[in-house]
Amino acid sequence: MTFNIIKLENWDRKEYFEHYFNQQTTYSITKEIDITLFKDMIKKKGYEIYPSLIYAIMEVVNKNKVFRTGINSENKLGYWDKLNPLYTVFNKQTEKFTNIWTESDNNFTSFYNNYKNDLLEYKDKEEMFPKKPIPENTIPISMIPWIDFSSFNLNIGNNSNFLLPIITIGKFYSENNKIYIPVALQLHHAVCDGYHASLFMNEFQDIIHKVDDWI
């Protein structure tokens, strides 16, 4: 895990960062992602949808430095070389969830196998964060598979100055012979503008459409 320091005085985003950081401005955007081909391919290959979506999300995040920009435990501004997903897993018996992290991997099969191993070991632990220690370079991903939504927002008391993206996925639904899934993206305006939110959604849709290239 390498954290690269950003020298604020020389950063071309300095004015924007200081303005929105002082205001602590965050925002959310939700988009319906077409997963028609993706869902069919995942089913044919015998994979689960949730980890496959997590993999696709992390491909977009790790491709773009802006989504890896944050503040570390030493209160330094910078960006990580790579982020790992910290995702929720629901326990039907307790009706609570755990948060498990898995090492990111550019190879889908390797990531999927690591996910399955982590799931097997930690999913039944009655702790909120059973896999410890949790590295700093993680981003929160969750799924609410019981409901589709058109918007979703998290209200966070941002005393820790959390700048990284937060992604929430909803229940997939059918419309006009297509299958869609809502994806909510929460960003901090200090590091990400509307352009970057659009970049994430467009690249995520693209990698979902090109599932044949990586599965």
From Swiss-Prot:
Q: Which residues carry out catalysis?
A: 189
Please give the PROSITE patterns that the UniProt record associates with this protein. CAT (PS00100)
Against InterPro entries, the record matches this protein to:
CAT-like_dom_sf, Chloramphenicol_AcTrfase_AS, Cmp_AcTrfase
Record has Disulfide bond as a keyword: no
Top-level taxon in the UniProt lineage: Bacteria
Report the sequence similarity comment from the record.
Belongs to the chloramphenicol acetyltransferase family.
**What's the protein called, per UniProt?**
Chloramphenicol acetyltransferase
Organism, by scientific name, is Staphylococcus aureus
